[in-house]
Amino acid sequence: PGTKGFVSMIAEDGTFVKAEPIFKDIKVVDMIETANRLLAFVEGYEVRHAVIEDVHALYGSSAKGTFTFGYNSCVPEFFCAIAGLPYTKIPPKKWQSDMHKGIKMVTKNDGTKTVKDVKKMSIVAAHRIFPDVSLKRTNRSLKDDDNFADSLLMAEYGRRHFK
């Protein structure tokens, strides 16, 4: 979830089907337009199970930022509930510990200490599992998108655990 979040679909055999950003315009979240886009995304497919990241507000975030984050993070869950799709909410550490297995730890300096760079690790893991999928947000993007990578990895996590 989040304004830059993605929705991804993979087949039962693990092949990539499609993916796209949840919100068309991250500056203006239009719920009707988003719901219609998500309905079009699943139309014609038998969705067996959806996995939604169970996220929480970050300590130190502003009230406005926390409210916006909470509002946007509920969109996938509301969509699944309204569309009648089975879903499970999974904490990031749970799916990451499974999907990052075998990936050498990547670190970054957060200003005070060295911490694990889970965004880069997700990109590496997604490239290993889906080597033919470009993780670029758009055709014009220069860098891989960690939101796209996370979405793919959560779809794969769901495929492995919720058959």
What do the PLM-derived regions correspond to, one by one?
Residues P1-K163:
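Phosphate- and other anionic-substrate recognition elements at nucleic-acid/protein interfaces
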